[in-house]
Regions:
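Lumenal/periplasmic acceptor-binding loop at the mouth of the active site in multi-pass
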Residues: 24-158
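Transmembrane alpha-helix segments characteristic
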Residues: 6-12, 145-152, 165-185, 237-238
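Hydrophobic/aromatic-rich transmembrane helices and adjacent perimembrane loops
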Residues: 180, 192-217
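Signature aromatic-anchored transmembrane alpha helix within multi-pass, membrane-resident enzymes
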Residues: 7-11, 161, 165, 213-246
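Soluble catalytic regions of membrane-associated enzymes that act on cell-envelope
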Residues: 56-100, 248-296
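Membrane-interface catalytic loops of GT-C/OST-like multi-pass glycosylation enzymes that act
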Residues: 139-142, 164-168, 184-201, 254
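Alpha-helical transmembrane signal-anchor/signal-peptide segments
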Residues: 20-42, 251-271
Length: 296
């Protein structure tokens, strides 16, 4: 029965892809790769258009973008043709794990440092280590006063393993597979065309489960040890965390009256002659143009 249930859940999850193939059969104006048959659908799911990359070859990810005027490899090694194991380790920890995962995790539950993101500065190639064990940049630990969501989430992990270790282990598995395991699988090179926090939403959901469990555990402990009204504690937790986050983050997440993407697409299309062909530099440039052309 368990095997049948697990199989059905896997099929149910993969069934969401059917929407793509159904829409492709309708031949919409924008039809990425046109996955309307088995072969094209297989290529679509495997992302064949993006080429092949190695999950384990970290050295290649360090220097893959070292051609032309791009000198990002200097953040990790003095010589891209002779990379040391120490430099590979520093690249994996400081860039792939810290900058491309832990920083995003901290944004969700600790606090993001302002609207304008800045990349960490390169260390000198002479003398100082290429990459030091620097703290996470772009993170403001005091943004919400105290990072209550993070603290209660940590308490939730402890409380969950103490009360129900089997289910806690299942949540931990979800947290790792949708977080750190994805970091290993993607083997991201530097630079990336955009922030990649959306790739780890599953791990954020898993930690949110522990925030809920931690809140319950905290209420139970306070009620048991101090004979305090649990409803008051629940109300304080319910109000303090989301209200403070909403108050501090509303402006940065409010997209009203921001027309940069609209203006960018409008001006680009207006620069073309009738029936002209416009070459774009990837999807970041293409999507607003599609919106302007097909919707507006």
């Amino acid at each position: 029965r368990l095997i049948i249930t697990c199989t059905m859940m896997v099929i149910l999850g993969y069934s969401t892809y059917s929407m793509i193939f159904i829409r492709a059969q309708q031949n919409p104006k924008i039809n990425y790769n046109n996955p309307e048959d088995i072969q094209s659908a297989y290529q679509y799911i495997n992302r064949d258009q993006y080429g092949q990359w190695s999950i384990l070859d970290r050295e290649t990810s360090m220097v893959i973008n070292s051609q032309g005027n791009n000198e990002s490899w200097k953040r990790y090694t003095k010589n891209p043709k002779k990379v040391t194991q120490e430099e590979v380790t520093e690249f994996v920890w400081n860039y792939q794990f810290k900058e491309m995962y832990l920083r995003y995790f901290a944004w969700q539950f600790i606090g993001k440092e302002g609207w304008n993101e800045r990349s960490w500065t390169r260390n000198s190639l002479d003398g100082a280590p290429l990459m030091s064990m620097r703290p996470l940049q772009g993170v403001d630990i005091w943004r919400y006063g105290l990072p209550l969501a993070f603290i209660i989430g940590l308490f939730g992990i402890f409380y969950h393993f103490k009360r129900d270790p089997k289910r806690a282990l299942s949540v931990l598995t979800l947290f790792i597979l949708t977080g750190l395991a994805i970091v290993v699988y993607l083997n991201q090179s530097d630079p990336q065309p955009r922030e990649r926090d959306y790739a780890y939403v599953g791990s954020f959901f898993a930690f949110a489960i522990w925030i809920g469990i931690g809140s319950y555990g905290l209420i139970s402990e306070i009620k048991q040890k101090f004979n305090f009204n649990s409803k008051i504690v629940a109300l304080i937790l319910l109000i303090s965390m989301p209200m403070m986050m909403g108050f501090k983050d509303w402006y940065e997440h409010d997209r009203s009256n921001r027309y940069e993407a609209w203006d960018y697409a409008y001006n680009l299309l207006n620069s073309c002659e009738p029936n002209g062909i416009l070459f774009t530099n990837g999807d970041n440039d293409t999507f607003p143009l599609w919106y302007m052309q097909e919707v507006e």
